[in-house]
Amino acid sequence: GLDVVKDYKQIRQQVGYMPGRFSLYQDLTVEENLDFFATVFHTTIRENYDLVKDIYQQIEPFRKRRAGALSGGMKQKLALSCALIHKPEILFLDEPTTGVDPVSRKEFWEMLRHLKDQGITILVSTPIMDEARQCDRIAFINEGEIQGIDVPERILQRFSHILCPPGLERTEVHAGNDFAIEVDQLTKCFG
């Protein structure tokens, strides 16, 4: 293992991080943000283009636009490109789809599957259970403590009393890869 104090430079090269509030420089253009993050990691966009190509091609038409003028979905793609620019082995994503429209959210999860297929380990924090279901394993955290780690279906079964408390009716709707829970009488529990 690595020591987080002594080996921080090596760890920084191996880890990509995308915070929930995208850490982009709003006054810089798309291209300038990517160049900046590449420089921080002693690389270039060209050197690691193969990893970000599929994502970058979607934002390339906006490369001269300031990040602050992008839509939520475009900011998300730019932030992901910046987190990947140095080819990390592990990618940490903190609530990556918060505030993003449903179409961009779906596209984002498709991008994550593609990155996983390329061998990148991805850790995602999300309060959205249909997103958690797309993961191979879930660490279910309740009131600040890990309650269990398992595959999504077993976590949902084991903690259904927390995820859907007694007296709260729900209907699960499955349509292909999409998943939704319709909850009745929500104000009864949360007033």
Each model region followed by its residue ranges:
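Conserved ABC ATPase signature
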Residues: 66-70
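Hydrophobic anchor residue at the start of the ABC signature
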Residues: 80
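Conserved catalytic motifs of ABC-family nucleotide-binding domains
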Residues: 87
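Catalytic Walker B motif of ABC-type/P-loop ATPase nucleotide-binding domains
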Residues: 91-94
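ABC ATPase "signature
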Residues: 149-150
